[in-house]
C-alpha cells in the first residue's frame, strides 16, 4: 500500500493518517462535508422554488405578514445541523488534549530557526539526557529522493505502537509544532510547556513544519519524524553514547 505522508504538488487533500487522532479528524471532516452538502442542496432547492413560483405567481407576497411554521422550520433545522457538527467536534477536541499514561516523553524546543529534541526518559552514563538539534537540509546537500525544505540533517526517532508524549516549548519567539499525518498542531511558547500525545500505528517517515510566523527564516523549520519498530529504536538509542533507561 502506498501512503501519502508528505505534501504533494497541487495536493488538495489531507495526508494519510498515522494516528487515531488524525483518523478522527478525517472522519469529522467527512461528516461535516456531508452535512454542509445537505444544507447547500436544501437552500439551493428553496431558492429555486421561490424564484420560479414568484415569477409565475401574480399574487403579491407583500401581503403575507408571517409564517410561523416556516419560521420554526428554518430555525430548528440549522440548529440541529449545528449540534450534529458541534458534539463530535468537541469530543474529538477533548480527546486530542488528553495525555494518559504515556510510555515515553520527547521534549520539543523551537528556536530561530531549527528544532531541538530531548529524550528525557533516556540518559547517558554521565547523567546527560539524549538531545540533539535538527536543521533544514541545504539544497546543495540534498541527495536523490530527499525533499526540498522538508528534509533535515537529523530526524526525530520514535517507536511504533507506543504512546508518545510531546512536551513543546520555545526558547525565543512563538513557534508551532505541526505534523499533519499525526494530527498534531501545538503552539511552542517561550516560558510555557504545552503537551500533546500521539500513538503512531505504522512505521514510516512523516514531515511537518513550523506553522507560526517566527521570523525571516520561518519557512526553513521543517520537522522530520521517523517511526521505526521498537527493536530499531532500541538499536538507535544504543548509538547515542551509552544510553540507558532512566
From Swiss-Prot:
Cofactor(s) needed for function: Cu cation
Highest taxon in the source lineage: Eukaryota
Binding site for Cu cation A2: 210, 212, 214, 218
InterPro entries in UniProt: CcO_II, CcO_II-like_C, CcO_II_C, Copper_CuA, Cupredoxin, Cyt_c_oxidase_su2, Cyt_c_oxidase_su2_TM_dom, Cyt_c_oxidase_su2_TM_sf
Cofactor details (free text): Binds a dinuclear copper A center per subunit.
Keyword Transmembrane helix recorded: yes
BP terms from Gene Ontology: ATP synthesis coupled electron transport
Catalyzed reaction equations: 4 Fe(II)-[cytochrome c] + O2 + 8 H(+)(in) = 4 Fe(III)-[cytochrome c] + 2 H2O + 4 H(+)(out)
Listed EC numbers: 7.1.1.9
Class in the EC hierarchy, top level: translocase
Transmembrane segments annotated in the record for this chain: 31-51, 72-92
Keywords, comma-separated and alphabetical: Copper, Electron transport, Magnesium, Membrane, Metal-binding, Mitochondrion, Mitochondrion inner membrane, Respiratory chain, Translocase, Transmembrane, Transmembrane helix, Transport
GO cellular component annotations of the record: mitochondrial inner membrane
Record localization: Mitochondrion inner membrane
List of residues binding Mg(2+): 212
Entry binding sites for Cu cation A1: 175, 210, 214, 221
GO molecular function: copper ion binding; cytochrome-c oxidase activity
Topology with respect to the bilayer: Multi-pass membrane protein
Subunit structure: Component of the cytochrome c oxidase (complex IV, CIV), a multisubunit enzyme composed of a catalytic core of 3 subunits and several supernumerary subunits. The complex exists as a monomer or a dimer and forms supercomplexes (SCs) in the inner mitochondrial membrane with ubiquinol-cytochrome c oxidoreductase (cytochrome b-c1 complex, complex III, CIII).
PANTHER family recorded: CYTOCHROME C OXIDASE SUBUNIT 2, CYTOCHROME C OXIDASE, SUBUNIT II
Its job: Component of the cytochrome c oxidase, the last enzyme in the mitochondrial electron transport chain which drives oxidative phosphorylation. The respiratory chain contains 3 multisubunit complexes succinate dehydrogenase (complex II, CII), ubiquinol-cytochrome c oxidoreductase (cytochrome b-c1 complex, complex III, CIII) and cytochrome c oxidase (complex IV, CIV), that cooperate to transfer electrons derived from NADH and succinate to molecular oxygen, creating an electrochemical gradient over the inner membrane that drives transmembrane transport and the ATP synthase.
Membership in a protein family: Belongs to the cytochrome c oxidase subunit 2 family.
Name under which the protein is recorded: Cytochrome c oxidase subunit 2
Organism: Debaryomyces hansenii (strain ATCC 36239 / CBS 767 / BCRC 21394 / JCM 1990 / NBRC 0083 / IGC 2968) (Yeast)
This protein's encoding gene: COX2
Amino acid at each position: 500500500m502506498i501512503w501519502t505522508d508528505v505534501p504533494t504538488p497541487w495536493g488538495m487533500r489531507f495526508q494519510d493518517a498515522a494516528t487515531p487522532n488524525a483518523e478522527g479528524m478525517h472522519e469529522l471532516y467527512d461528516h461535516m462535508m456531508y452535512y454542509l452538502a445537505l444544507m447547500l442542496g436544501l437552500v439551493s432547492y428553496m431558492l429555486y422554488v421561490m424564484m420560479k413560483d414568484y415569477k409565475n405567481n401574480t399574487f403579491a407576497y407583500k401581503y403575507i405578514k408571517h409564517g410561523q411554521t416556516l419560521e420554526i422550520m428554518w430555525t430548528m433545522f440549522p440548529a440541529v445541523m449545528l449540534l450534529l457538527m458541534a458534539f463530535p467536534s468537541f469530543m474529538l477536541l477533548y480527546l486530542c488534549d488528553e495525555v494518559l499514561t504515556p510510555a515515553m516523553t520527547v521534549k520539543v524546543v523551537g528556536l530561530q530557526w531549527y528544532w531541538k529534541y530531548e529524550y528525557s526518559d533516556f540518559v547517558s552514563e554521565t547523567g546527560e539526557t539524549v538531545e540533539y538539534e535538527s536543521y533544514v537540509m541545504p539544497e546543495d546537500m540534498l541527495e536523490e529522493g530527499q525533499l526540498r525544505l522538508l528534509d533535515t540533517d537529523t530526524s526525530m526517532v520514535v517507536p511504533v505502537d507506543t504512546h508518545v508524549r510531546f512536551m513543546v516549548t520555545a526558547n525565543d519567539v512563538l513557534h508551532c509544532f505541526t505534523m499533519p499525518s499525526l494530527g498534531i498542531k501545538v503552539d511552542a511558547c517561550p516560558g510555557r510547556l504545552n503537551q500533546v500525545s500521539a500513538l503512531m500505528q505504522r512505521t514510516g517517515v512523516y514531515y511537518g513544519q513550523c506553522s507560526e510566523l517566527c521570523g525571516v527564516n520561518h519557512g526553513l523549520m521543517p520537522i522530520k519524524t521517523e517511526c521505526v519498530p521498537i527493536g530499531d529504536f532500541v538499536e538507535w538509542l544504543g548509538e547515542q553514547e551509552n544510553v540507558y533507561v532512566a
